């Protein structure tokens, strides 16, 4: 994962991912160079309380580990936002 600290255009241009089913479907499609926003806030703490978020973030990290996508952390208005670029 890498951190980006420029404008918030990444956030505005992203597609919101709220379910594991949606996150999984992203990788069944041909790569489109789109940005998917999957969380804003304290990811580690929030994953402990939210099983769906835990599954989504583990999927994105696993896909990034094998080179299928990039996981990006970005500060927007003092909030930490997490994205996957695929």
Where are these regions (language model features)?
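Short amphipathic alpha-helical interaction segments
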Residues: 49-65
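A generic structural signal for short, non-catalytic loop/turn and secondary-structure boundary residues
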Residues: 29-31, 64, 77
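Short amphipathic alpha-helical interface segments
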Residues: 2-52
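A broad, low-specificity signal marking well-ordered, structured residues that form hydrophobic/aromatic
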Residues: 36, 70, 82
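A short, conserved structural fragment
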Residues: 65-74
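Short, intrinsically disordered low-complexity segments
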Residues: 15-17, 61, 84
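Short, cationic-aromatic polyanion-contact patches
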Residues: 74-86
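Functionally constrained cores in energy, signaling, and assembly domains
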Residues: 23, 60, 69
């Amino acid at each position: 994962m890498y951190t980006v600290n420029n404008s918030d255009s990444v956030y505005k241009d992203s597609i919101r991912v709220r379910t594991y089913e949606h996150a999984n479907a992203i990788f069944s499609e041909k790569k489109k160079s789109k940005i998917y926003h999957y969380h804003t806030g304290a990811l580690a703490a929030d994953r402990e309380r939210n099983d769906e978020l835990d599954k989504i973030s583990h999927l994105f990290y696993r896909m990034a580990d094998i080179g299928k996508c990039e996981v990006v952390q970005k500060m927007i208005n003092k909030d930490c936002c997490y994205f996957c670029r695929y």
